[in-house]
């Protein structure tokens, strides 16, 4: 489990600096922060952060034929800044962008919940920023359909050797040969957090050890749940809002995805039905935390109390500033996690995935600068400096254990091998509403999936037909 490749280890370095989106965009709260007092457009002047000399020298050795940009300022519309906070190290991609291309990032601040509203206002006013994060997994196809983003192909050579490692992933964000996302890395989207004390106190097999043995599967997961759960003692197997989708994606089949250049729904797929039946049986056996009895409020603290066995959520929960890991155990070193269990009937170990990447905003004034930054991100993602910076931050700032670091890298390695990207949130709000809650009904309410899909299939297909037509009109 600890034989992690350098390429995979670099994922944490990238995630630490590029994928900060997880801090805001994946919260499990039911309401977003109030943004009514936000200014129409707050910007932070482009600055040049610095890196220590040893790391900077390593970045300088990476040669991609960089030439100084005529316009070095890239305006980044986001709720988070690519420039490091005071006292934090600069990301390898940003260091390369600054030192080799003479580039800088100008942060255009927007509240996360209204980022698309602000984007539309700026595009319509011919005041477009340049770059937008694709880490929320909702840029494509929605952003392409709405005309908020331009293809990157005139500026980024996706067929080049530099971009070869992400070729298959980037094709999932392409239509008729036009790429709307420059994905530079794949990350695990959902993992199973647990308290090692709870595992020990209940004489259960450690999931991390089961994974190392190649035996972390739906079946061993089921055995653990049935041994642990006790309704009278209020002991339940899973909590949170991430389980249903994350578990289903281990089948290798998303509810909505891309196939042969079209947006498709897979509601009738037999593998999805298997996942739904598994979750229905969880409900019938009272294994899942009954959120309905608690006003639909999740209870992450129960993990520390030994009352909940697993808390499935994004890897961003490992960062202390997100205020999750503190609820999982009284001591951080007792927190552990594993990927979602393998679907035994699947031909590979598929895992839910998200990407670190960016898109080119419609009417951007500096597309060349966006391309240069993306090339820097690709060139540095497996660099020695990226690995070392990521490790230092994980151990020195976040107080991770070696075991946690190794598992983080392993999850990202496994996800990169067989990623499954869910797109029902990326087509339209109607599609999201039609799929998101219904696909959770078997798990939460004991509803039959065969009946549920009958009530949504026609409406989902009609929405996808409309989306495909609009997408075709853009090309």
Q: Which role fits each region the language model picked out?
A:
Residues 45-70, 111, 135-190, 219, ...:
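Hinge/lid segment of periplasmic solute-binding proteins
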Residues 223-225, 261-293:
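Glycine-centered hinge/linker elements that transmit conformational signals in sensory
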Residues 9, 23-141, 381-385, 399-402, ...:
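Conserved N-terminal structural module of periplasmic/extracytoplasmic solute-binding proteins
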Residues 352, 387, 405-475:
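C-terminal capping/gating helix-and-loop segments adjacent to ligand/active sites or protein-protein/ligand interfaces
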Residues 75, 174-186, 190, 200, ...:
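Extracytoplasmic/periplasmic solute-binding protein
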Residues 326-394:
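Extracytoplasmic/periplasmic substrate-recognition and gating elements
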Residues 153-165, 210-213, 254-274, 326-328, ...:
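Short, solvent-exposed loop/beta-turn-alpha elements that line the ligand-binding surface or hinge
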Residues 65, 121-122, 129-130, 158-200, ...:
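A structural signal for short loop-to-beta-strand junctions that line the ligand-binding cleft
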């Amino acid at each position: 489990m600890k034989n992690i490749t350098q390429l995979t280890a670099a994922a944490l370095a990238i995630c630490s600096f590029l994928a900060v989106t997880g801090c805001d965009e994946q919260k499990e709260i039911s309401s977003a922060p109030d943004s009514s007092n936000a200014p129409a457009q707050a910007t932070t002047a482009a600055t040049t952060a610095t890196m220590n000399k040893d790391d900077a020298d390593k970045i300088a050795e990476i040669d991609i034929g960089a030439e100084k940009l005529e316009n070095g300022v890239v305006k980044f519309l986001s709720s988070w800044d690519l420039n490091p906070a005071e006292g934090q190290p600069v990301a390898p991609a940003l260091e390369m962008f600054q030192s080799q291309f003479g580039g800088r990032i100008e942060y255009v601040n927007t509240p996360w919940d209204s980022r698309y509203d602000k984007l539309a206002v700026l595009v319509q006013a011919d005041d477009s920023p340049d770059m937008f994060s694709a880490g929320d997994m909702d840029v494509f196809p929605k952003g392409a359909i709405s005309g908020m983003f331009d293809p990157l192909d005139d500026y980024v050579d996706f067929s080049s050797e530099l971009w070869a490692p992400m070729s298959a992933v980037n094709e999932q964000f392409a239509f008729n040969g036009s790429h709307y996302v420059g994905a530079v890395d794949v990350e695990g989207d959902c993992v199973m957090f647990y308290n090692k004390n709870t595992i020990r106190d209940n004489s259960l097999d450690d999931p991390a050890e089961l994974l190392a043995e190649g035996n972390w599967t739906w079946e061993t997961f089921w055995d653990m749940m049935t041994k642990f759960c006790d309704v009278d003692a209020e002991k339940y197997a899973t909590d949170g809002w991430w389980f249903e989708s994350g578990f289903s994606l281990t089948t290798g089949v998303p509810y909505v995805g891309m196939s042969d250049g079209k947006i498709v729904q897979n509601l009738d797929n037999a593998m999805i039905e298997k996942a739904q039946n598994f979750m229905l049986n969880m409900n019938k056996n009272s294994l899942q935390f009954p959120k309905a009895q608690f006003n639909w409020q999740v209870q992450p603290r129960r993990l520390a109390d030994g009352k909940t066995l697993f808390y499935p959520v994004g890897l961003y929960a490992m960062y202390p500033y997100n205020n999750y890991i503190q609820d999982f155990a009284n001591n951080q070193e007792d927190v552990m996690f594993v990927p979602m269990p393998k679907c035994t009937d699947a031909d590979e170990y598929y895992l839910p995935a998200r990407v670190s990447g960016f898109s080119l905003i419609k009417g951007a004034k500096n597309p060349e600068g966006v391309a240069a930054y993306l090339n820097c991100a690709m060139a540095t993602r497996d660099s020695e400096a990226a690995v070392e910076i990521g490790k230092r931050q994980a151990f020195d700032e976040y107080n991770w254990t070696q075991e946690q670091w190794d598992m983080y890298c392993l999850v990202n390695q496994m996800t990169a091998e067989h990623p499954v990207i869910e797109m029902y949130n990326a087509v339209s709000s109607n599609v999201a509403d039609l799929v998101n809650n219904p696909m959770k009904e078997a798990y939460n309410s004991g509803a039959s999936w065969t009946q549920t899909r009958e009530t949504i299939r026609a409406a989902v297909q009609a929405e996808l037909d409309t989306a495909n037509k609009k997408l075709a009109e853009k090309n």
